[in-house]
């Protein structure tokens, strides 16, 4: 029997690309308990308002909500607990260099499966101001209008 094709994305932070300029992305493993993995596989994870921070040379993701697994009983952990991200030391040193600069933060973009393991796409990001968001919306609307015009002209 062949493997299932399709998206392995389990959760996505959709507002991240709207609220931040993404500078670099890193792939990180995440330290989870078995019931958390089962809950994530059911699609019960939320990355909204989550961020990562570096403490004592280790990277932790905060405010990532993973709903308790229904059949998990005593093995369920706190849904909003800090979870350790697994990165190489050299990557952590690069992230420390970025985050010490003013305005940069670490944002998880998505949770996905890779070879049966849950991974986090972690981005080094800089916050957008309100006028940057408006400019991005205007550019997107102009591009959509141009595409509509091109499609309309090529129809005849």
From Swiss-Prot:
Alphabetized UniProt keyword annotations? Cytoplasm, RNA-binding
Q: Name one GO cellular component term.
A: cytosol
One biological process term from GO is: trans-translation
Q: Name one GO molecular function term.
A: RNA binding
Q: Does the keyword Transport apply?
A: no
| Residue runs in coiled coils | none
**Does the keyword field hold Cytoplasm?**
yes
Question: Where, per UniProt, does this protein localize?
Answer: Cytoplasm
Q: Which Pfam families match?
A: SmpB
The text of the family note is: Belongs to the SmpB family.
Its annotated function is as follows: Required for rescue of stalled ribosomes mediated by trans-translation. Binds to transfer-messenger RNA (tmRNA), required for stable association of tmRNA with ribosomes. tmRNA and SmpB together mimic tRNA shape, replacing the anticodon stem-loop with SmpB. tmRNA is encoded by the ssrA gene; the 2 termini fold to resemble tRNA(Ala) and it encodes a 'tag peptide', a short internal open reading frame. During trans-translation Ala-aminoacylated tmRNA acts like a tRNA, entering the A-site of stalled ribosomes, displacing the stalled mRNA.
Name the chain's protein: SsrA-binding protein
């Amino acid at each position: 029997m062949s493997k299932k094709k399709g998206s392995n994305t389990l959760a996505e932070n959709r507002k991240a690309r709207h609220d931040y300029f993404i500078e670099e992305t890193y792939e990180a493993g995440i330290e989870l308990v078995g019931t958390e993995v089962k809950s994530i596989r059911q699609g019960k994870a939320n990355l909204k308002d989550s961020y990562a921070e570096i403490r004592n040379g280790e990277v932790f993701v905060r405010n990532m909500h993973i709903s308790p697994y229904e059949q998990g009983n005593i093995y369920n952990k706190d849904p909003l607990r800090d979870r350790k991200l697994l990165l190489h030391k050299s990557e952590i040193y690069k992230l420390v260099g970025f985050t010490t600069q003013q305005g940069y933060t670490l944002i998880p973009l998505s949770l996905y499966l890779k070879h049966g393991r849950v991974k986090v796409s972690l981005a080094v990001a800089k916050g957008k101001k309100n006028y940057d968001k408006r400019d991005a919306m205007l550019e997107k609307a102009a591009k959509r209008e141009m595409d509509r015009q091109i499609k309309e002209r090529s129809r005849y």
